[in-house]
Design a protein with these regions (language model features):
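Membrane-targeting and insertion segments and their boundary/processing signals
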Residues: 33, 40, 73-76, 80, ...
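Long, well-ordered, tryptophan-enriched scaffold segments
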Residues: 31, 38-77
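Short coil/turn segments at secondary-structure boundaries
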Residues: 39-41, 61-62, 77-84, 118-120, ...
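An acidic, carboxylate-rich microenvironment
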Residues: 22, 58, 418-420
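Helix-enriched interaction subdomains in cytosolic or periplasmic regions
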Residues: 57, 71, 77-108
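C-terminal non-catalytic regions of proteins with extracellular/luminal or membrane-system context
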Residues: 4, 8-11, 17, 42-54, ...
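Short acidic/histidine-rich active-site segments
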Residues: 1-13, 17-18, 26-28, 32-39
Length: 469
């Protein structure tokens, strides 16, 4: 299959095909069996076959592969969906529980000064007031290319359901990010700054009497999306929060209340000031239909967050490109700033603490075709059960072509009780040490490799393994 318009783009954008037929012939010869979404390039193939420019056998091959997939899927014997099977798969208690669990496990705790988890008083005791503020507080943001579930739970609704009558909840939108949230709309208009500043004043008034603030900010589906055409853009020149969201945070921070920021977004944001001044930060990404309940589960300690960042979060757009497995370079740094990211790849905190020890190897020397077992001790040094993800990285000390400074080769998320220690074992096979050499061959070169382990890509302990010498 081709991506949408990829075949016609050979003519329209990349200028490597003179006509639709030219693009179609090249795609067919490369093994592409279907032209999506309109088929406007492959529509030329019938005439090309009749006139001898494309062999009919090439069409037969593509059709045979497509029909084989349909046969394997049983679509000829039973081409219709089974409504009863569909009902068992989605929109039921089991599916909603799975969505909630997925959201719970996806959240990444970036900062916590002890503000989290929130404690609730006993029934009948004095009630705290929690201000739930922000443009992503009362809406469930599902991201791009999403289905439309019958029921979604916002952060506001999840918190209300969790606290019941044991806390007072006040809400204010704070700001609008965009004029509307329609992901499909071509035009994106930012909300009016003057109107937003009026909303900020309302949020400050609502939060003034609160004991703590939950601030849900980040993206809408419009500000973090695929830009699939010149009239449907998605890229931005900045990683800063869109619109007046930073102003909203600053105004709430001036109240002197503990602030927990919940980020709902589709890409990393540059939040240096918030990272410094917020009391707690949760990176949620897009949490799905049960996201509001899952956020409440984490805020009130029913679930101990254990997610890890799948990307590096830079301090500013000027640090880009920024990724953990960069190549060695002469990049020396910046005037007035650091090359260190705001949060490294693989980072994530917990309501407990862990100690990830130095790795040990089953052998310090192995042949080129050999494997090694890496054992990493991890101990829960805190007072409650929690998850830690042990990560193993490899670095080739000297190689014939430049390689990344570290490459993630294995990881495992483990749940440990307070005080529990576990040895987490990984087997690294020859594939873990392979590289493409200057002859474009996938090989293992003899030499020393650093085997590094830790809780994230920036805090690693290393041992040396000799391969093939």
């Amino acid at each position: 299959l081709s991506d949408y318009y990829a075949i016609s783009d050979m003519q329209d954008i990349h200028a490597i095909a003179a006509t639709r037929e030219d693009a179609a012939r090249r795609a067919l010869a490369a093994g592409v069996d279907a032209d999506l979404p309109t088929g406007n390039s492959y529509a030329t193939l019938a005439a090309a076959v009749r006139e001898g420019r494309v062999p009919e056998a090439a069409i037969d091959t593509a059709v045979r592969r497509m029909l084989t997939l349909k046969v394997r899927a049983g679509l000829f014997e039973n081409p219709y969906a089974d409504a009863k099977v569909e009902a068992r798969l989605t929109n039921n208690a089991e599916a909603r529980a799975l969505a909630r669990t997925a959201a719970q496990r996806a959240m990444v705790l970036l900062k916590n000064d002890g503000t989290l988890p929130f404690a609730l008083p006993a029934e009948g005791a004095a009630k705290p007031t929690i201000a739930v503020i922000g443009p992503s507080a009362a809406v469930a943001r599902l991201g791009g290319y999403f289905g439309i579930p019958p029921v979604t739970v916002s952060i506001l609704d999840g918190i209300k359901a969790r606290v019941g009558t044991r806390a007072n909840i006040v809400f204010a939108q704070g700001v609008k990010i965009t004029e509307n949230d329609d992901w499909w709309a071509d035009e994106v208009k930012l909300a009016d700054p003057a109107a937003n500043r009026a909303l900020i004043a309302q949020a400050v008034a609502a939060a003034r009497g609160a004991d703590r603030i939950v601030l849900a900010i980040g993206d809408t589906e419009q500000t973090s999306r695929e830009g699939w055409a010149k009239n449907h853009l998605g890229d931005r020149p900045s990683l800063d929060l869109v619109g007046e969201q930073q102003e909203l945070f600053d105004a709430l921070k001036a109240l002197g209340k503990p602030i927990t920021v919940v980020l709902i977004n589709g890409r990393p944001a540059s939040i240096v000031k918030i990272a410094d001044q917020a009391n707690a930060i949760i990176e949620g990404w897009y949490l799905g239909e049960q996201g509001g309940n899952a956020v409440a589960d984490v805020l009130f300690g029913d679930v101990n967050p254990g997610g890890k960042l799948p990307v590096t979060i830079p301090r500013s757009v000027g640090q880009l490109p920024m990724f953990y497995n960069a190549k060695p370079s002469a990049r020396r740094g910046y005037l007035f700033d650091t090359t260190a990211p705001l949060y490294p790849f693989g980072f994530g905190l917990s309501y407990t603490t862990f100690d990830v020890g130095a790795p040990t190897l089953s052998a310090t020397k192995i042949p080129l075709s050999g494997s090694v077992t890496v054992s990493v001790p991890v101990r829960n040094t805190g007072a409650r059960a929690g998850d830690e993800t042990v990560q193993v990285y490899v670095r080739d000390v000297v190689s014939s072509v430049t390689r990344s400074i570290k490459e993630l080769k294995a990881f495992r998320r483990v749940t440990l009780a307070p005080g529990e220690t576990r040895q987490v074992a990984f087997t690294l096979t020859p594939e873990a040490f392979q590289m493409w050499n200057d002859k474009m061959q996938r090989v293992v070169e003899p030499g020393d490799f650093q085997i590094m382990a830790g809780p994230d890509s920036a805090h690693l302990k290393a041992v040396t393994l000799t391969v093939g010498n």
